[in-house]
Amino acid sequence: LEVKVNTVIIKNYNEHQIIPITQRFFEMGVSVRFIEYMDVGGTKNWNPEQVVFGDEIRTIIATRFGRLKPLKQQKYGEVANRWSLSNGYEIGFIESISKPFCQSCTRARISANGKLYTCLFSERGYDLKSLITMGADIKDLRDAVIALWRKRDDRYSELRTVQQVETNPVAVSYTHLRAH
């Protein structure tokens, strides 16, 4: 079982933990992924000035562990930019604020109330629960998800401005399904 630990870094809150987090998970042999603080799920009082960008995190890590080397993407739609230390330890960076990846996103999410969201930031969900209630089988669900995915036009991260974004909170499971 491959384990990856995701951690969100927020300026003036936990950025002082970047080195200890890296050290701890390096010692455990567990990959860590640093996530830029995002305005996801209607996060209240999100402020872009609180974002610690991936480049900044890499600079901090380099002061203790040496220069990081970028790694090639393993598969299309991979959300983490992977880097390695000179000893081969891999660190991931999910940089949806500074380096949006909307065009290559392959992630969909299903909420607790059975709605499919084609973007983590989306306020608009598609009702899959009703399909199931009406007797849809797995092929029907698959076809519905594929059709919804093909017509998606979500580009929230690419279109985000530096102004605070007003959204309605959506309770979304962070377990994702991969749409192919």
Model-assigned labels for residue ranges:
Residues 7-8, 37, 72-74, 161:
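Proline- and acidic/polar-enriched loop/turn elements at helix boundaries
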Residues 147-174:
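Charged phosphate-binding loop/patch that engages nucleotide di/tri-phosphates or the phosphate backbone
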Residues 175-180:
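Conserved small/polar residues in nucleotide/adenosyl-binding loops
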